[in-house]
């Protein structure tokens, strides 16, 4: 069995938006959303370099990366720690490019980042620590998002 379990795979495939944290050359953090985040295999994630110059530059200097993927309604997700490799040519790059084209990604893809996941952990909202059920959390955040669609404001509290 790999590092990425079936539930983690499901979350990544459903959400597709991951947040990648890398380290800048001056040792400051860089956090960047990656709308092409996908599970490549049981031990790897992948995302496309569409507009990621800082992320790619950082990984070329320091391959340390963490990717977080969270369902904004259930407030559950996954944290993946590992190393990222930037691929701009070769068989794996070609396979990843074909993968994204099949998914309908039409943007220019300059490279892909293959993340070797060394550690994968679940993420959950503190609301669960207080005894909230997933249904309660989902209902609370569905109401919030519905209010936003209607032009209302006011986020749920306690999370």
Model-identified regions with their sequence ranges:
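C-terminal edge-of-domain segments
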Residues: 83-88, 92-159
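Short beta-strand segments
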Residues: 15-49, 67
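Short, surface-exposed beta-strand-loop junctions and turns on beta-sheet-rich folds
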Residues: 37-38, 53-54, 86, 130
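Short, structured beta-strand-loop surface elements
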Residues: 17, 54-99
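Solvent-exposed alpha-helices and their adjacent loops that cap or buttress functional pockets
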Residues: 10-12, 38-40, 105-107
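Beta-strand secondary-structure signal
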Residues: 46-48, 66, 81, 112-116
């Amino acid at each position: 069995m790999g590092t990425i379990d079936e539930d983690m795979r499901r979350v990544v495939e459903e959400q597709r938006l991951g947040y990648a944290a890398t380290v800048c050359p001056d040792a400051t953090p860089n956090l960047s959303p990656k709308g092409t985040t996908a599970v490549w295999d049981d031990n790897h994630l992948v995302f496309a370099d569409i507009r990621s110059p800082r992320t790619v530059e950082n990984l070329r200097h320091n391959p340390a990366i963490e990717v977080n993927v969270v369902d904004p309604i259930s407030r559950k997700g996954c944290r993946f720690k590992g190393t990222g490799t930037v691929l701009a040519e070769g068989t794996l790059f070609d396979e990843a490019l074909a993968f994204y084209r099949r998914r309908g990604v039409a943007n220019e893809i300059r490279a892909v980042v293959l993340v070797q996941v060394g550690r994968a952990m679940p993420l959950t909202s503190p609301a669960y620590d207080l005894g909230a059920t997933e249904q309660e959390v989902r209902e609370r955040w569905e109401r919030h998002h519905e209010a936003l669609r209607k032009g209302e404001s006011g986020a749920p509290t306690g999370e």
